[in-house]
């Protein structure tokens, strides 16, 4: 069943997962600004005294209401300040992992003194944009990130331009391992998962380790909305059944609770999002435990889940009005279905039912309530799998669901790419009005 050699397509799949599934400490939008601030601070000899920052509307949306790990505070200003004063620019999405208590205190003092300003970049044609300009005495440094949470495109100081990334987006897309996703299919992904050597994908077990630890932390503490721990209490009170469906709901919610509540543990992200990584991981872990899967089966199921989630999300804008926990849960549905019967038809039916169920869920910014959407998406994924196991699914006669799963995915993604752009603007306007 398993092949010893890795063909070029499979190698591209592996590289795509390695590119998109990475550890991240804290919600990735404020972390992107923290990284810009840290990288700018690294260009200066003195201590940063003041910060001006500019972000895209989508990054503002996802940074307004989320807790920054280790600070107990929400928002982009504290992320920028802590990045500048205690961040490690070389750590990427884990830029704040070694921030000291002193750095946190200094960052809070900088905010209290009114020395941090975060503004909308206007006009802004980029969905993901963050720029931090930091000052120390008469010196300054400015770093700009565009397109991806860690993609630094320009570094400039008062002495001149230090670095600029050439504008070769088409060439980068051609050379990117993600480029293969534009001309592949779920069937090819499944064939890869079924036959690739275990040693080549063993690394994906780190997702189970990191996101499993977040789930345990979420159940121990009162993080965020503490959905997971609250539902666990309702089980003890006899108000909720202690079964597999509930375990998926509770353990997935708990990981997102800890993530959004500011726990100082990294998540294994997917497509630039910790919650997407959690959603693609934890439900699969729970089902794998239930069926007694060994590490190899778990790795294959996780690879199917994460790669399917990446495949779907690759057809979306990096950030949009569509809650991407839903698309990550489509990956989880594939992984869970594979663990139980392994048939392509079951996987396809489960994803189609997901599209017919949760496709209208909006993204109204990163916050503690993301855990609600993560839990809803995980529950919907398991429901879709249970239906598919009995050869039942939302069909092409209903709504945006088509007669084949690939077209259903394309239909869903076309909504986010085109029709939901005005929705996104309205969401941002509503959130901005609340901030004043």
UniProtKB/Swiss-Prot annotation:
GO molecular function annotations of the record: L-cysteine desulfhydrase activity
Q: Which cysteines are joined by disulfide bonds?
A: none
Which Pfam families is this protein grouped with?
A: SDH_alpha
Look up the domain of life of the source: Bacteria
What is one Gene Ontology biological process annotated in the Swiss-Prot or TrEMBL record? Answer: L-cysteine catabolic process to pyruvate
Family annotation (InterPro entries)? Ser_deHydtase-like_asu, UPF0597
Q: Which family does it belong to?
A: Belongs to the UPF0597 family.
Q: What is this protein called?
A: UPF0597 protein YhaM
Give the species this sequence originates from: Salmonella dublin (strain CT_02021853)
Q: Which gene encodes it?
A: yhaM
């Amino acid at each position: 069943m398993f092949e010893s050699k890795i063909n070029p397509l499979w190698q591209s799949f592996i590289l795509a997962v390695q590119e998109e599934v990475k550890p991240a400490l804290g919600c990735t939008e404020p972390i992107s600004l923290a990284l810009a601030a840290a990288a700018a601070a690294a260009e200066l000899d003195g201590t940063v005294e003041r910060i001006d920052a500019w972000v895209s509307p989508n990054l503002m949306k996802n940074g307004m209401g989320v807790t920054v790990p280790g600070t107990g505070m929400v928002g982009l200003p504290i992320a920028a300040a802590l990045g500048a004063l205690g961040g490690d620019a070389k750590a990427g999405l884990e830029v704040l992992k070694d921030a000291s208590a002193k750095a946190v205190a200094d960052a809070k003092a900088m905010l209290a003194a009114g020395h941090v300003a975060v503004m909308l970049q206007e006009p802004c044609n980029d969905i993901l944009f963050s720029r931090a300009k930091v000052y120390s005495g008469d010196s300054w440094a400015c770093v700009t990130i565009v397109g991806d949470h860690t993609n630094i495109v320009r570094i400039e100081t008062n002495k001149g331009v230090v670095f600029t990334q050439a504008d070769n987006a088409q060439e980068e897309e051609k050379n990117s391992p993600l480029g293969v996703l534009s001309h592949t299919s779920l069937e090819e992904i499944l064939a890869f998962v079924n036959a690739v050597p275990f040693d080549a994908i063993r690394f994906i077990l780190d997702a189970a380790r990191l996101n499993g630890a977040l789930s345990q932390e979420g159940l121990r503490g009162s993080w965020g909305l503490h959905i997971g721990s609250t539902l666990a209490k309702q089980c003890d009170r006899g108000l909720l059944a202690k079964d597999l469906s509930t375990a998926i709901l509770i353990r997935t919610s708990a990981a997102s609770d800890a993530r959004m509540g500011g726990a100082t543990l990294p998540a294994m992200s997917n497509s630039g999002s910790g919650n997407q990584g959690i959603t693609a991981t934890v439900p699969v872990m729970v089902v794998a435990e239930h069926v007694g899967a060994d590490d190899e089966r778990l790795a294959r199921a996780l690879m199917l889940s994460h790669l399917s989630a990446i495949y779907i999300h690759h057809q979306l804008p990096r950030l949009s009005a569509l809650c991407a926990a839903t698309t990550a849960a489509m990956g989880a549905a594939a992984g869970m279905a594979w663990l139980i019967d392994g048939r392509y038809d079951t996987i396809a039916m489960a994803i189609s039912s997901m599209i017919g169920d949760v496709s209208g869920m909006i993204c109204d910014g990163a916050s503690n309530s993301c855990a609600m959407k993560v839990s809803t998406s995980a529950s919907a994924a398991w429901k879709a799998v249970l239906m598919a196991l009995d050869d039942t699914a939302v069909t092409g006669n209903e709504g945006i669901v088509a007669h084949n799963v690939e077209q259903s995915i394309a239909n869903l993604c076309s909504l986010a790419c085109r029709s939901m752009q005005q929705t996104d603007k309205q969401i941002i306007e509503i959130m901005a009005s609340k901030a004043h």
